[in-house]
Amino acid sequence: MSKDPVPLKAVHHIEFWVGNAKQAAYFYRKAFGFDQVAYSGLETGNRDRASYVLEQGRIRMVFSTPLNSNNGISEHIKAHGDGVKDIAFHVDDAKKCYDACIDRGAKSARKPETLSDENGSVTKASIFTYGETLHSFISYNDYDGPFLPAVSYTHLTLPTIYSV
């Protein structure tokens, strides 16, 4: 029996590109009980998008929205509407998985690179699957942060909203 050339450990996250990430994140928190664990936007120095990272158990979703109309997310949403942009996988070796896919004819979206911050580092690489949808491979080198490094994410503690 041959060895799996792209051994996947788990789904790391699914990223949705949407017109209103704040509203989408609110809906998933209130309707399905997800917790918001990280945020990136103008307040964290990210000038092109706002992203909300939600978690429930081992499920992690990211809702990203453009902060201006001259950006790839804006163009993608205009062409396709809200939807999944990236299904990212947790793997032992992102470069090895990426190389195995490229060797088998996959089209590169993002060559392997190491992302680092004060919480450690990860290696991330991406390939195109069908259309403009991506599969990313993420391997943890020594990372112990809330989501991914070098993205200016900050932990959020959200107040409970009570209705009368």
Regions found by a protein language model. Give the residues of each.
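Short, compositionally biased segments
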Residues: 150-153
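Intrinsic-disorder/low-complexity coil detector
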Residues: 4-6, 145-148, 158
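C-terminal catalytic ATP-binding subdomain
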Residues: 123-141, 146
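Single conserved hydrophobic/aromatic residue that forms the stacking wall/gate
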Residues: 155-164
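Vicinal oxygen chelate
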Residues: 2, 8-9, 15-26, 30, ...
